[in-house]
UniProtKB/Swiss-Prot annotation:
It catalyses: ATP + H2O + 4 H(+)(in) = ADP + phosphate + 5 H(+)(out). PANTHER family: ATP SYNTHASE SUBUNIT ALPHA, MITOCHONDRIAL. InterPro entries: ATP_synth_asu-like_sf, ATP_synth_asu_C, ATP_synth_asu_C_sf, ATP_synth_F1_a_nt-bd_dom, ATP_synth_F1_asu, ATPase_a/bsu_AS, ATPase_F1/V1/A1_a/bsu_N, ATPase_F1/V1/A1_a/bsu_N_sf. This is ATP synthase subunit alpha. The gene is atpA. It comes from Brucella suis biovar 1 (strain 1330).
Length: 509
């Protein structure tokens, strides 16, 4: 066997020439100090604002403060394994999360990692969490209803697709219940509605108890609503940076549907806790505090998040993202800093009151203080026809009720108004987990405003409504289908509906 020296030397030369080409270039820095979920890092001169960095042990962080001599990094995870002198690597990527239909039915953390034990998520696409909201040109004014299934909201404070409607109230007034019922109300459309009407739901839990989030997921699962929902959870035991990031992560997941011509609904529960987490991070990063020790850009924090909910025009796929942010007030104080900020950003608010809740008026919506700035353009014509008068009647009823406390001798007209108001208030009550379809709401409210309840005792109103709906669902399906298809009460439908209610009222008495 002869050894060809020339051949071997050529191979060796070739290998030496290509050696070391694949050396990994990564810019690194050193931890100067760490504590309270914040690390100060020396080096990383070219790091971008909002870029992911990696600590030893795979813990991620995000560069937020870029100062002349160091970088302030918030840590997504436990900081107890990070020590002074540790090496920090740049990843070169701005913080992003997985998006797409693969996430439906899953519970994830603020970085999109699954926390429900159902295996990895094989998403085909990732998106940045913090992107610019759509401009003015790609948008269209809100005109399709986003039905919540709650009479008090769909009739009086309608929410449209692409709207941002704030749910505000003290603790334990049923804020989360409104979001949950809205999610459950989408079930019939997902089961047998057209694809273009389907509404995908995202629920972002910020700073909630784990037991509360688990309960929420359990209800969604039991009622078959988890299959079109995504739950993003940054619970009370998660570090502040995760609670700060969760709403943006959820929003990016919702935007995937919006930008693909579909419809999504996102509930942020709740933004007061996100603001508190952001305040904690800002103070630890030594940013100057402002009112109530919140940083100066806490308004911008919420406005850039909520501006991303939009209705896009037909050239851009006609998709929409509807936002239901939640704010928890202290002692019904709507004029505190964060509540006023979010009220001024959103297109209306649903104001829930403790007093109403304890009086048994649930959902505890204060109809006087709640508004929808989109209004009736987010209702179908049939609902406009029946609900037009109900708001005025309830307002008159509230005014009269305040006076009636003083005087006992009231004339017949006032008495009639008070009676009607009491029955309409009773009619707007609704138990949890029982959302109604729009056509059913129209039928019930039609009965209310046309005096069918005036002769009944107040405690009979609920039974009357139940019976009427049962009768319509079995014997008069054509009326409900007519309203659903026509989306308006034509004279023919009105006559049929009137006949159906008349027949039922006779048998009920």
């Amino acid at each position: 066997m002869d050894i060809r020296a020339a051949e071997i030397s050529a191979i060796l030369k070739e290998q030496i020439k290509n050696f070391g080409k694949e050396a990994e270039v990564s810019e690194v820095g050193q931890v100067l100090s760490v504590g309270d979920g914040i690390a100060r890092v020396y080096g990383l001169d070219n790091v971008q604002a909002g870029e992911m960095v990696e600590f030893p042990g795979g813990i991620r962080g995000m560069a937020l403060n870029l100062e002349s001599d160091n970088v302030g990094v918030v840590i997504f995870g436990a900081d107890r394994d990070i020590k002074e002198g540790d090496v920090v690597k740049r990843t070169g990527a701005i913080v992003d999360v997985p998006v797409g239909p693969e996430l439906l039915g899953r519970v994830v953390d603020a970085l999109g990692n699954p926390i429900d034990g159902k295996g990895p998520i094989k998403a085909k696409e990732r998106r940045r969490v913090d992107v610019k909201a759509p401009g003015i040109i790609p948008r269209k004014s809100v005109h399709e209803p986003m039905s919540t299934g709650l009479k008090a909201i769909d009739a009086l404070i309608p929410v449209g697709r692409g709207q941002r409607e704030l749910v505000i109230g003290d603790r334990q007034t049923g804020k989360t219940a409104i979001i949950l019922d809205t999610f459950l109300n989408q079930k019939p459309i997902h089961d047998n509605g057209p694809d273009k009407d389907k509404l995908y739901c995202v629920y972002v839990a910020v700073g909630q108890k784990r037991s509360t989030v688990a309960q929420f997921v359990k209800v969604l699962e039991e009622r078959g609503a988890l299959e079109y929902s995504i739950v993003v959870a940054a619970t009370a035991s998660d570090p502040a940076p995760m609670q700060y990031l969760a709403p943006f992560a959820g929003c990016a997941m919702g935007e995937y549907f919006r930008d693909n011509g579909q419809h999504a609904l996102i509930g942020y529960d709740d933004l007061s806790k996100q603001a508190v987490a952001y305040r904690q991070m800002s103070l630890l990063l030594r940013r100057p505090p402002g009112r109530e020790a919140y940083p100066g850009d806490v308004f911008y924090l919420h406005s850039r998040l909520l501006e991303r909910a939009a209705k896009l025009n037909d050239e851009n796929g006609a998709g929409s993202l509807t936002a239901l942010p939640v704010i928890e007030t202290q002692g019904n104080d709507v004029s505190a800093f964060i509540p006023t900020n979010v009220i001024s950003i959103t297109d209306g608010q649903i104001f829930l009151e403790t007093n109403l809740f304890y009086q048994g008026i649930r959902p505890a919506v204060n109809v006087g203080l709640s508004v929808s700035r989109v209004g009736s353009s987010a209702q179908i014509k049939a609902m406009k026809q029946v609900a037009g008068s109900i708001k005025g009647e309830l307002a008159q009823h509230r005014e009269m009720a305040a006076f009636a406390q003083f005087g006992s001798d009231l004339d017949a007209a006032t008495q009639r108004l008070l009676n009607r108001g009491a029955r309409l208030t009773e009619l707007l009550k609704q138990p949890q987990f029982s959302p109604l379809k729009t056509e059913e709401q129209v039928a019930v409210i039609y009965a209310g405003v046309n005096g069918y309840l005036d002769k009944l005792a107040v405690n009979q109103v609920g039974k009357f409504e139940e019976g009427l709906l049962a009768s319509l669902r079995t014997e008069h399906k054509d009326v409900l289908e007519g309203i659903r298809n026509e989306k308006a009460l034509t004279d023919d439908l009105k006559a049929k509906l009137k006949a159906a209610i008349d027949a039922f009222a006779k048998s009920f008495a």
